Amino acid sequence: MATQTIDDTSKITPRETRVGTSLKPLNSEYGKVAPGWGTTALMGFTMALFAVFLSIILEIYNSSVLLDGIPVSWD
């Protein structure tokens, strides 16, 4: 047997809050896509720099890169 709604009182309506009203302009550009590549090159460059940073940290942790004048001891 299927469920049947008798009246519309069970439907929830969203209430408007001050925070929602103040944040609404930030979401006004939702769904709009700028033509072209946009900031993809900047994002790729940033990801490459982050990968270099992570590899340097990994090499220091594995002691494959020794820094002069800085004692590296994990004891």
Swiss-Prot record:
Where is the PTM Phosphothreonine found along the chain? 3, 5
A single GO cellular-component term on record: photosystem II
Q: How is it modified after translation?
A: Phosphorylation is a light-dependent reaction catalyzed by a membrane-bound kinase; phosphorylation occurs on Thr residue(s) in the N-terminus of the protein.
SUPFAM superfamilies from the entry?
Photosystem II 10 kDa phosphoprotein PsbH
Q: Is Phosphoprotein among this UniProt entry's keywords?
A: yes
Tell me which domain of life the UniProt entry assigns to the organism this sequence originates from.
Eukaryota
Please tell me where this protein is predominantly located.
Answer: plastid
**Protein name from the UniProt record:** Photosystem II reaction center protein H
Q: Which organism is it from?
A: Pinus koraiensis (Korean pine)
